[in-house]
Amino acid sequence: MAGKGGKGLLAAKTTAAKSADKDKDKKKAPVSRSSRAGLQFPVGRIHRQLKSRASAHGRVGATAAVYSAAILEYLTAEVLELAGNASKDLKVKRITPRHLQLAIRGDEELDTLIKGTIAGGGVIPHIHKSLINKTSKE
């Protein structure tokens, strides 16, 4: 009892099914989580590292990795900017551990965050106030 309408619907379904199959063949290009978040640091790698080191038996949320990558990227950019300024002040084109040391110790917040020793960084020049204007009594 299929009339004209039945054949038309069946034909429409088959053409729609064919176009759906073509759409399935055209896969979207994979987009990394770093590019989705607008970051340069690898979110997937940081997520894997967090899972391997977490005391929660590998249970780390997806946004935790994105947030951690954003923090690391921001801190790296901040340190590199300050170290680049230090190397530019010394008229050198290459950033050395000395420039990193000057940049970190020159910024109060970074100094409190990074309290460790930087290999090859040298020392920060400092003369105590009592030694600057020492007058001899004669």
From Swiss-Prot:
It is found in: Nucleus; Chromosome. CDD domains: HFD_H2A. Residues 1-42 are annotated as: Disordered. SUPFAM superfamilies: Histone-fold. GO terms for molecular function: DNA binding; protein heterodimerization activity; structural constituent of chromatin. Its main location: nucleus. Residues 9-18 have a biased composition (Low complexity). The keyword Magnesium does not apply. The keyword Transferase does not apply. InterPro entries: Histone-fold, Histone_H2A, Histone_H2A/H2B/H3, Histone_H2A_C, Histone_H2A_CS. GO terms for biological process: heterochromatin formation. Disulfide bonds: none annotated. Residues 19-28 have a biased composition (Basic and acidic residues). Keywords: Chromosome, DNA-binding, Nucleosome core, Nucleus. It comes from the Eukaryota. GO terms for cellular component: nucleosome; nucleus. Variant histones H2A are synthesized throughout the cell cycle and are very different from classical S-phase regulated H2A. May replace conventional H2A in a subset of nucleosomes. Nucleosomes wrap and compact DNA into chromatin, limiting DNA accessibility to the cellular machineries which require DNA as a template. Histones thereby play a central role in transcription regulation, DNA repair, DNA replication and chromosomal stability. DNA accessibility is regulated via a complex set of post-translational modifications of histones, also called histone code, and nucleosome remodeling. The nucleosome is a histone octamer containing two molecules each of H2A, H2B, H3 and H4 assembled in one H3-H4 heterotetramer and two H2A-H2B heterodimers. The octamer wraps approximately 147 bp of DNA. Belongs to the histone H2A family. This is Probable histone H2A variant 1. It comes from Oryza sativa subsp. japonica (Rice).
